[in-house]
Amino acid sequence: MFTLTKALEKALLQHFIYTKLDIAYAINKPFPFFEALRDNSFITERMYKESLEACQNLVPLSKVVHNILTSLEQTFDPSMLLILFSKVNLREYPSLGAICRSFRNVGNAYEGRNRPAPTLLGASTNPAEGCSFQTLLPQPRSQALPPSHLSSGLRIRDPGTTSLQITEILDEQPSPSHPAAPLPGYIREGKTTPVSSRDHQRKDKEDSQEMPHHPSGPEAVVKDILTSKTNNRDDSGAQPPGSPGTMHVVQDNSPAPNDPEVPQEAPCTPANKKARKRKSCIWSNSKRRRQKKKPPQHKMMGVASPGPGVQEKLKVVGQRTLNQDDSTRNVKVVTRTLRERTRCAQTSSSQEISKEASKPRARKRPQKRPHTAGRTIHVPEKSKDDAVDFLSPTLSVTCGEARGTLFKEKLKQGSSEKCIQNEAGAWLTVKEFLKKGGKATSKDWKKAIRCNKKTLRSLEQDGFLFCTSKSKPQKECD
């Protein structure tokens, strides 16, 4: 396990903050993510129940997970990453694999900037662990080997021991015609990268999609490099000797003269056999892809080019393929033009239909109905009672053709008082106002005088008018 520095822990926290949203969307179901955090005491029982209740209340799962990650950000612990990218979580949530690789890239970048890297203390002996600091973080490079040991293979650590031991040395057989090319990504500039044996066990069990793969930078995680002699000889015979993807590997059990450690032969187990078969298939597929991209072998090896007859045949075959490609391309162009024509015709017809529909139709003139004489409809005039305020101290009164203004306060003193003012401004009594209107012989002056088509008698009954005198105005005048 690696001893973490504060700078590396800060870099991991910063990257955790950046990838927090991606992790939230990678978790597509509550189990077993919530349970793993609760069982390892990263979240409380209360937060666990609240998160499940929020999911039952149709709150988006990504939002609930993001809230949990935000709380974990406040109390960040690098051991939380081991629970997050455990074997169970990587199997249940496949999208976490890319995020786990991004954390390894952060460790690789930190190793490139800061030398020396964190110290390698030991490897976990439990093969059931899905992720550890040894696989999550970059591993340091070993010291440079002398030129006589540049062809030595990777050193594999035995899980049962307490120090790094050599279990297998793969030596390169020197070839008189060409030097052996080093395997890219594993041996560079005379340096080797130590790898623990638990990496091989984990790579044999997990799927290749879940395995981290970094082809460019210095890697600490290697899939499997143990191959049989027969497969290596077949690969070397089928591929040019100078290619960067091949390496002649021969097992040598004799100890190196300048190597201080004693080599030990690793036992051949069925898991290693399966790994060899799988690795040989992977290498053969990659070899075929590289052979398609590379030029012919006769150009690389310096062999003379084929004769003119073969070249003519190759030209004829190439012309045939070009003609076939041109014919298929022409067919595609013709079908595309036909589609465009039909589409244009459909659009033009639809535009014409829309124009015809949008044209204004001629309005028909309404036919005049024959006028029927003798039918006169009398519309009743609207009553103006609502417009008159009977509670005002003055009322507009009429008596025949005479018009004037009645003052309620003066009428309370008696009908003999001059309480009506005519249009000329003269003050009149009730009797004088009746004479002006031509109704001097009226027996009831309250019915003869009207206010907006209502008699003073009706106004008195309604409470709008008060008269103290009960005597008739004729007697008062007498």
From Swiss-Prot:
Q: Where is this region: Disordered?
A: 131-310, 337-385
What keyword terms does UniProt attach to this protein? Apoptosis, DNA-binding, Immunity, Innate immunity, Nucleus, Phosphoprotein, Transcription, Transcription regulation
Show where the SAND domain sits.
Answer: 385-466
Query: Where can this protein be found?
Result: Nucleus
Keyword DNA-binding found: yes
PTM Phosphoserine: list the residues. 175, 177, 254, 305
One biological process term from GO is:
apoptotic process
Residue interval(s) of motif Nuclear localization signal: 279-294
Which Gene Ontology cellular-component terms appear in the entry? nucleus
Which residues lie in Basic residues bias regions?
A: 273-297, 360-372
Which stretches does UniProt call biased (Polar residues)? 131-142
InterPro entries in the cross-refs = HSR_dom, SAND-like_dom_sf, SAND_dom, Sp110/Sp140/Sp140L-like
What GO terms are given for molecular function?
A: DNA binding; DNA-binding transcription factor activity, RNA polymerase II-specific
> According to the UniProt entry, which residue ranges have a biased composition of type Basic and acidic residues?
197-213
Function per UniProt? May act as a transcription factor. Plays a role in the innate immunity against intracellular pathogens. Required for resistance to M.tuberculosis and L.monocytogenes. Promotes apoptosis of infected cells.
Put simply, this protein is called Sp110 nuclear body protein
